[in-house]
């Protein structure tokens, strides 16, 4: 099975490799750098040497030293993942302090959301979203 961009999509039974919602297989140039990022920066739960749970998503990391880093957020395929928070400014600052790359500082999208972006060591973007329909409040903080 493929998504509209041609990426392989695999449906797995609930609980397979601890996946209960979404599992994302990611190639990384350095498993050591990715492990530091997931463990220390995101403070994700380590399931094994190359598998992490962050909220309801399980990331399955595969080391490939030849993997090209992400250089553009626009294009086909996976470009970023999103995490919902109550205070984007605080979450963004915390992730940057822990080692994430500051990709886009927090800003407000009308009355819909306050968002920002950070990046991992391979340049994969993470959207930090304070969505009004979920948090009720878009004030900075």
Give residue spans per PLM region.
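Short secondary-structure boundary/hinge segments and terminal tails
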Residues: 56-57, 112-114, 141
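General secondary-structure edge motif
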Residues: 17-18, 71, 75, 102-103
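Solvent-exposed, well-ordered amphipathic alpha-helical segments
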Residues: 30-35, 46, 50, 58-66, ...
């Amino acid at each position: 099975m493929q998504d509209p961009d041609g990426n392989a999509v695999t449906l797995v039974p609930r609980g397979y490799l601890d996946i209960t919602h979404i599992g994302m297989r990611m190639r990384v140039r350095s498993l050591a750098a990715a492990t530091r990022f997931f463990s220390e920066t995101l403070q994700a739960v380590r399931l094994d040497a190359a598998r992490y749970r962050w909220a309801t998503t399980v990331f399955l990391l595969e080391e490939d030293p030849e993997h090209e880093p992400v250089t553009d957020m626009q294009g086909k395929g996976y470009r970023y993942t999103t995490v919902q928070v109550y205070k984007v400014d605080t979450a963004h600052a915390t992730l940057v302090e822990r080692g994430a790359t500051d990709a886009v500082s927090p800003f407000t999208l009308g009355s819909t959301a306050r968002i920002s972006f950070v990046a991992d060591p391979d340049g994969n973007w993470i959207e930090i979203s304070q969505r009004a329909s979920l948090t009720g409040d878009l004030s900075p903080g």
